[in-house]
Amino acid sequence: MISAQDLIEKITSAATCDDCIVVVRDKTQANLRWAGSTLTTNGVIQERSVTVIAFVSVNGAMASGGVTRTDVSIADVPALLDAAIAAAKAAGPADDYAPLATNVSIGNWSAEHVPTGPEVFAKFAPALGDMFSRSVADKIELFGYSEHTNETTWVGSKGGLRLRKDSPVGRVEMTGKSHERTRSTWAGVETRDFTDVSVADIDAQIRQRLTWQGTKVDLPAGRYDTILPSGSVADLFTYMMWVSTARDAHEGQSVFSKKGGGTRIGEKLSNISLQFFSDPDFKQLPASNFVSAAVSSPFSSVFDNGQPIKRVDWLKDGVLQSLIQTRASAKLTSLDFTPLGENLVMSVDGASGSLEDLVKKVDNGLLLTTLWYIRMVDPNSLLLTGLTRDGVYHVKGGEVVGATNNFRWNDSPVSALSRIAHAGATEWTQPREWAGDMSNMAMPALVINDFNMS
């Protein structure tokens, strides 16, 4: 297979359009899957995607169009360029136009993609096998998977962009069932290379929660002080970010639209001193410091490829500070260019402690395991609905006293920001609903007052 760098050079040198950007992504992934406390499959996946974006002058304006293919060879280059140019001409003048970056170099351009493989599980797999043995002896069934992905992205252009980033990430998701499958719980862990994954901690969490489910407590629908683990916080606020584009807010189409026009930037949304930001230099979750966009969307623009990504405060001290911008939308809204970064971090000033510490602070409430099947109900308030899954626990006097029924919940993350009673320490966490979409998230566990359960 031709190297990504050589392919980009071939395409950009052959391009006859005004400018041309090529985005190549090489991805390898190793995985393990198990069911009934028995390993069922393992494998390695290798993928490449090549996106060619043509920029063409049309009637005094600039148009863009792109095509994406896999397994591109040198012989495919002319047809690929023709298709991208045709797509640009058909699209007409781009409403997200901004001057293209030129002559920007970031990262080790010439280095090869470093593939992952089964060796990444060298420490994890034996520990997992031991957990299987213990679970069989104790009549606990384990289901789940682990995967490790390394993706390398190269962005090159006629105008001199030579950008490269590497994104290694792994995760474990595991469900434990016992007592003829009448009890079920879940645990999820994010990792960079599996050297820091504690199977013992996963085992202990699953066993503790299955034990809690030995006592049943029936509770009615209503509003409860609710402890959300950091992963559930990540699920809620991922959805909030997905509706946080400045253009939609400016045009009156989102929860962040201001009555009478404009956006709610500058409005205090949280009752506590809460920080919510993206930062490529955040030590625990380093991320790319440049924009790489294969397609234009409300969240990004192909015209912004190569633009720098710096720290962006979405909420600062509980005040809405920024919304997601392309350079074109920033000009339209007369606000700063604040591109969406590759990580999201939430922290609460002065907060510390674990999920267990938060339980001790709740007199009468609920402890959730995960949120599931999250859907929008009302975009104007960002009212969401969803289900609880794999364990809801009744907390009384600072202790878990038993498991209760699952609920359908109905609440808004924007509203929840104003009802935070307690917060734990920020930790790298795994959302459950959006685990396949978001991996670089650090969140605290939160206690939300009056969380609506139906």
Task: Set out the residue ranges of the language-model regions.
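Active-site bordering "gate/hinge" segments
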Residues: M1-S301, Q307, K316-D317, G397, ...
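Dual-mode signal for accessory low-complexity, basic/Gly-rich regions
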Residues: G261-S454
